[in-house]
């Protein structure tokens, strides 16, 4: 039994798991493993962008997954962060997060985009080192990540800001402050955690893909569970779907240890200089 436990632990090490997946698909390159708390999925996409722009690869496959365990659940319970009810991001009656499981994959290529392509325009990772589990109360790390990722992109060109929105007291309050500081308070905001919970390592990839599909469809998903504003800085949040004709969005994530990531995604025609 002891040998089986050791063998299983060895197989489940991140590097070994990544190599097995690459080997299964016949890819002989050494996988790059990105493990940075809850921003891992978005951090991996930003890493892919940098690898492509540096000319190291022509195509990068980014995949992320996470499953629940007694260790993970007990960890969140120790922070009193879990809700026994369905989570309610940014709502006045929110009581904590729900955990979920998922796996998601997205493929990036270095090429001249056609109008229907999605382009990762820019991404940034910033840290605030406020606390091992609590974010900066002024949203400093998230604010700096947003500003760095936005660059010259105008807020009014964004259809959506897909936020972390975990439904915890501190995260949602921090994000509302960061978004207002960055001038994004009038851009439609949603959190997808109410649909499938917090999928941790998969969240950044899964929520990016769903946001792409949402904007492609011209319908922004509502924030499930939201009813009444429960943060100090107002945001444009709706529990109901909304229509849009815009073709760009921002994705935000934050994680334990004070890590924050932001990225801007844009359709190829806008990226190539089309009308906004």
Protein language model regions, located:
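Acyl-CoA/ACP chain-elongation machinery
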Residues: 56-78, 83-87, 94, 123-137, ...
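Alpha-helical metal-binding/catalytic segments enriched in His/Glu/Asp
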Residues: 45-48, 103-111, 205-212
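Stable alpha-helical structural segments in soluble proteins, enriched in small hydrophobic residues
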Residues: 44, 145-153, 178, 182, ...
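Short beta-strand-to-turn element immediately C-terminal to the catalytic PLP-Schiff-base lysine
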Residues: 106-111, 179-180, 238, 263-268
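Flexible, low-complexity linker/loop segments at domain and module junctions
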Residues: 155, 233-276
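Conserved catalytic cysteine-centered active-site region
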Residues: 8-47, 56, 72-74, 78-99, ...
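Condensing-enzyme catalytic core mediating Claisen C-C bond formation in acyl metabolism
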Residues: 82, 86-160, 269-275
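Short, small-residue-biased leader/transition segments that mark boundaries at the very start
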Residues: 1-5
